Amino acid sequence: MHNIFKGLITALITPFKDNKLDLYALERIVKHQIKHEVDAVLIAGSTGESSSLSFEEYKLLLQTSVEIVNKCIPIISGCSSNNTTYARALAAESTKIGVDGFMASPPSYVKPTQHGIYKHFEALHEACNLPIMLYSAPTRSGVDFSDETILRLSKLPRILALKDCGVDLERPLRIRATVKKDFNILTGNDEVVLAFNAQGGVGWTSVASNIVPNICKELLEKWNKNDTKGALEIHQKLLPLYTALFVESNPIPIKYAAHYLGLCENEIRPPLTEASDSAKKQIENIITSLSIKI
């Protein structure tokens, strides 16, 4: 099975207007990614406010994204839930709609054991025939995969990758030493992309690339061509942007940044709230200093 989980994957925001999906803005957002040749887009992940979506909204979001992309790049859907039955339904619907793969985290809040995490993903694996990326987000889930559980899950034929949002930079080396060769490991933290890939990662699921996909793509291309100096120069330039985009809970800052650049409304669903005035100012200043334009 072809492994689509590599390179630059943008964790897309979900645009809203008047508390409904803004499909016109979604088209702008997705086409901006296609224009700059990202390797894939992730729909309805944490950055996409997936927990705020109804099942009908989830289906509409995926269906519209598939139509817009029209097979130009792979689409990855988020299928995280603390209810295994509901997560299976998301995976089955993703398959029916025609996405290219999906991502899921361990069930949040309920704090399953490692055996429970394994059984959850085994159930998702059985629910569809799509490639799957594990999503390690311990600060959001409250639990994480152990190295042993990752190894067990990697033996299931369609579990092909791990997106790691943790801070253990030795983990890619440890995992790489045990899993099958075609199992990919990507970082979900913009600020550690180079350090992570130096330790065995093969890509990056990025928040910042919602607004600077061209720069993020250039950074990764330089890294992959062994132009370490060039990659570091770009990374250093982007560090203040990474900081600004996480000055408050994701996706609050990136939603405002996208709004400021004309991609969408600055509408975010409760219990999240709009960026504070100080956060807005910080975001505006870095966008101006980097001359970011859409």
From Swiss-Prot:
Identify one Gene Ontology CC term for this UniProt entry. cytoplasm
Enzyme Commission code = 4.3.3.7
Q: Which GO terms describe its molecular function?
A: (R,S)-4-hydroxy-2-oxoglutarate aldolase activity; 4-hydroxy-tetrahydrodipicolinate synthase activity
InterPro entries for the chain = Aldolase_TIM (IPR013785), DapA (IPR005263), DapA-like (IPR002220), Schiff_base-form_aldolases_AS (IPR020625), Schiff_base-form_aldolases_CS (IPR020624)
- Report which superkingdom the organism of origin falls in: Bacteria
Q: What are the record keywords, sorted?
A: Amino-acid biosynthesis, Cytoplasm, Diaminopimelate biosynthesis, Lyase, Lysine biosynthesis, Schiff base
One GO biological process from the UniProt record?
A: lysine biosynthetic process via diaminopimelate
Q: Locate the site labelled Part of a proton relay during catalysis.
A: 46, 109
Broad enzyme group: lyase
Q: Could you tell me where this protein is found in the cell?
A: Cytoplasm
Give the principal location in a single coarse category.
Answer: cytoplasm
Query: Pathway, per Swiss-Prot/TrEMBL?
Result: Amino-acid biosynthesis; L-lysine biosynthesis via DAP pathway; (S)-tetrahydrodipicolinate from L-aspartate: step 3/4
Pfam families per UniProt = DHDPS
- Binding positions for pyruvate per the UniProt entry: 47, 205
Active site: residue positions: 135 (proton donor/acceptor), 163 (schiff-base intermediate with substrate)
This enzyme catalyses: L-aspartate 4-semialdehyde + pyruvate = (2S,4S)-4-hydroxy-2,3,4,5-tetrahydrodipicolinate + H2O + H(+)
Instruction: Show the PROSITE patterns listed in the entry.
Output: DHDPS_1, DHDPS_2
Query: What family is it from?
Result: Belongs to the DapA family.
Provide the assembly information.
Homotetramer; dimer of dimers.
The protein's job, in short, is: Catalyzes the condensation of (S)-aspartate-beta-semialdehyde [(S)-ASA] and pyruvate to 4-hydroxy-tetrahydrodipicolinate (HTPA).
- Return the protein name: 4-hydroxy-tetrahydrodipicolinate synthase
Q: Which organism is it from?
A: Rickettsia conorii (strain ATCC VR-613 / Malish 7)
